[in-house]
């Protein structure tokens, strides 16, 4: 019984956060999944019509198109040194943060060698638009996989979980909208349970906190 007050507090806080998730929190969103999909498809089409362009060129052009639409103050510069590994849910990939705030994050995520794992269960909606390669995903009861190819957006709803895989050379633009701080432990716990890659953890925390602080204090973006 001594834990009852704590459990009650957690329940009340969770209830309030869930109410705010559908009422107040969306008023802070600046990104629209449909618009992001249109921007991505526009860049993908241009690259499909061109020759000699690399995957990195594609990623940089997506970033530039986003900055042109939303403004450089909200979209970080593409700096190769700011790519970091991401170990979460048994999967390992690479990511660079384009925008991070309390209510949203926008990243380029992918893998040069291929990966497979658990999506995690999040207090946020996740929109995963494939830029190059493929993502395969499935719910627990599925007997056939969902297949997402360039230009398609995979929407993982709040509270749901899937198994997913991406072959080598697959990259995507990922938008999460919700209580972003609640997602962070999922991205950090593998450091202590398996990888012990403290440098990557430090870089991830630093880059995330830097951008959240900038958007909260400078851009007044929650």
UniProtKB/Swiss-Prot annotation:
Membrane topology annotation: Single-pass membrane protein
UniProtKB keywords: Endoplasmic reticulum, Isomerase, Lipid biosynthesis, Lipid metabolism, Membrane, Steroid biosynthesis, Steroid metabolism, Sterol biosynthesis, Sterol metabolism, Transmembrane, Transmembrane helix
Positions of transmembrane segments: 3-23
Disruption phenotype: Abolishes the production of ergosterol.
Upregulation: Expression is increased during ergosterol starvation, during anaerobic growth or in the presence of SR31747A, a sterol isomerase inhibitor. Exogenously-supplied zymosterol is entirely transformed into ergosterol, which represses ERG2 expression. However, exogenously-supplied ergosterol does not affect ERG2 expression.
Pathway involvement of the protein, from the record: Steroid metabolism; ergosterol biosynthesis; ergosterol from zymosterol: step 2/5
Documented activity regulation: Catalytic activity is inhibited by the morphilines tridemorph, fenpropimorph, and fenpropidin.
Additional comment: Present with 2640 molecules/cell in log phase SD medium.
Protein name in UniProt: C-8 sterol isomerase ERG2
Organism: Saccharomyces cerevisiae (strain ATCC 204508 / S288c) (Baker's yeast)
Lineage summary: Eukaryota, Fungi, Dikarya, Ascomycota, Saccharomycotina
């Amino acid at each position: 019984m001594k834990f009852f007050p704590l459990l009650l507090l957690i329940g009340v806080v969770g209830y309030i956060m869930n109410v705010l998730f559908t009422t107040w929190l969306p008023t802070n969103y600046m990104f629209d999944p449909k618009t992001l999909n249109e921007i991505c498809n526009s860049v993908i089409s241009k690259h499909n019509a061109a020759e000699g362009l690399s995957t990195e060129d594609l990623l940089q052009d997506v970033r530039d198109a986003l900055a042109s639409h939303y403004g450089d103050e909200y979209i970080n510069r593409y700096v190769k040194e700011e790519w970091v590994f991401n170990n979460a849910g048994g999967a390992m990939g690479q990511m660079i943060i384009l925008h991070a705030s309390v209510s949203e994050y926008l990243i380029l995520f992918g893998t040069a060698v291929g990966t497979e794992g658990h999506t995690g269960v999040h207090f946020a909606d996740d929109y995963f638009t494939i830029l190059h390669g493929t993502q395969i995903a499935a719910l627990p009861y599925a007997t056939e996989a969902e297949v997402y190819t360039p230009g398609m957006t995979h929407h993982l709803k709040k509270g749901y979980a899937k198994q997913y895989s991406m072959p080598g050379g697959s990259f995507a633009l990922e938008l999460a909208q919700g209580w972003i701080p609640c997602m962070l432990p999922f991205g950090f716990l593998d450091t202590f349970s398996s990888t012990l890659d403290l440098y990557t953890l430090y870089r991830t925390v630093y880059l995330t906190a830097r951008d959240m602080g900038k958007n909260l204090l400078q851009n007044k973006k929650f």
